[in-house]
Amino acid sequence: LLKSQGYKVRLRKMDPYLNVDPGTMSPFQHGEVFVTDDGAETDLDLGHYERFTNISSKQSDNITTGRIYSDVIKKERKGGYLGKTVQVIPHITNRIKEFIKKDITNEDFVICEIGGTVGDIESLPFVEAIRQFSNEYGKSKTLFIHLTFVPFLKSSDEIKTKPTQHSVKELRGIGVQPDIIICRSQQSIPLDQRKKISLFCNVPIENVIETVDVRTIYEAPISFYNQKLDKQVLKFFKLKPKKRANLSPWKKITKIVLNTKKTVNIAIIGKYVNLKDAYKSLDEALVHGGIANNVKVNLIRIESDNLKNSEIKTKLKNVSGLLIPGGFGKRGTEGKISAIKYAREKKIPFLGICFGMQMAIVEFARNKLKIKNAGSSELDKKCYPVIGLINEW
């Protein structure tokens, strides 16, 4: 919304986990990593930022507790702190503040998201750092937005604001007073409940914004615009729009998504399909391809581990295309190869990415060229290596 009104924006993510980066984390734990233009493996949220804003992310836009501690310890080992006792405050919090300010050119706004939940031990240094940052940089130049969950109890047909009140109380106890509260809810929040949040959380009623379940995620910017979220942000900073906001692209996309009648089924076969975020970039690419072609893409996720030959015909019966993404390890490879064979014989459009393409070569070698023990030397040293590491050539 700020970008559409002529402002230059930078988006950043701070993750409280102790991993240095998400590159070596299991997709089951954290979903798929997002690779930035400069080659960094970062949190998948940076992918959401890029898709919504069309602003390219950099390695400097994502940091973790693990990276921060690693940097501080390396500096201490080199004598960078001149023998001082290294502590969370000020040394860790100073490093967090450096991250917020680092690599900024001529952006008007820097939006930093802190992962986790208020009250988590892991998040405390980040909350303390933004408290200090606001105090040092100026309260009129820093805006705190708190995202909170407002549950709807179906049994009693009521919305509960107590979790939000306690969350804000916890945040204020650390020294951070939210300026805007965004309330995530399944149902629209009645005015009297919003007034209650405003009263107990010390936030103006117009700054209590609801984000209700929408039919498609692309309706979210329109919803925020209708509630004047961008207007309240600019009002806080005493700024005016540089140009009139243009939400027609979002309205156009929403209209296509909601009114498209034609559907295509695309199967994704992989090891991590049980976690929706494990192949997030593929999901988004296919959905966006559907929008561009005025069709709804129905994604069928099939786990490769237990995929049997007898099941393939049934599971791939009505698919318009097959996608096998990247991966590693022997587990699930035979299921992928069997599915590729079926797609080739039935002339189903197929796309293999990285490991998926390697398995396509193995399948062709085995079933078309009749090389019975064809395989990858990465998985089996005794196979006929139609796929091999470059140092084995």
Regions found by a protein language model. Name each.
Residues 300-302:
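Structural recognition of alpha-helix starts/caps
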Residues 1-4, 318-393:
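Cysteine-nucleophile active-site neighborhood
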Residues 1-295, 304-321, 329, 336-342, ...:
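Flexible phosphate-sensing "switch/lid" loops adjacent to ATP/NTP-binding sites
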